[in-house]
């Protein structure tokens, strides 16, 4: 059984994240979407909120599980018995950062493979920070994020 970990802050989870998770779950037996709990990072949603939103948003993906971690990613991957780290890339700009991160992780843990998924065309142009900015200005993000996230963003920015 192959377990893969898809780490991220998921602040908030987007349809692009869910697309990567769904595609990874067709290849791996289990995909753990691991929410990185970084108290020193400026986040809109708490770790608990991000986990709840992810769980609600992945109910339709039976092979996808949700967890949190606050250690080195490779240490977490080992602790759950996984052998693969899943990452998504939207555009060429992501390649440099993902390449450097992959090199670091492979140096720290040569036994863990890194699998990069290219974002589906319709998800290449936005990120969680783009979603937050649009939502903060009152824009419609329902085409970028799952329903539970739309409602959470409205609450976070005081809109109904």
Curated annotation (Swiss-Prot):
GO terms for molecular function: ATP binding; pantetheine-phosphate adenylyltransferase activity. One of its GO terms (biological process) is coenzyme A biosynthetic process. Its cofactor is Mg(2+). It is an enzyme of class 2 (transferase). Substrate binds at residues 9, 41, 73, 87. Pathway: Cofactor biosynthesis; coenzyme A biosynthesis; CoA from (R)-pantothenate: step 4/5. Pfam families: CTP_transf_like (PF01467). It is found in: Cytoplasm. The record marks 17 as: Transition state stabilizer. The keyword Ion transport does not apply. It comes from the Bacteria. Keywords: ATP-binding, Coenzyme A biosynthesis, Cytoplasm, Magnesium, Nucleotide-binding, Nucleotidyltransferase, Transferase. One of its GO terms (cellular component) is cytoplasm. ATP binds at residues 9-10, 17, 88-90, 98, 123-129. The keyword Cytoplasm applies. It catalyses: (R)-4'-phosphopantetheine + ATP + H(+) = 3'-dephospho-CoA + diphosphate. Its EC number is 2.7.7.3. Belongs to the bacterial CoaD family. Reversibly transfers an adenylyl group from ATP to 4'-phosphopantetheine, yielding dephospho-CoA (dPCoA) and pyrophosphate. Homohexamer. HAMAP family: PPAT_bact (MF_00151). This is Phosphopantetheine adenylyltransferase. The lineage of its organism: Bacteria, Bacillati, Chloroflexota, Chloroflexia, Chloroflexales. The gene is coaD.
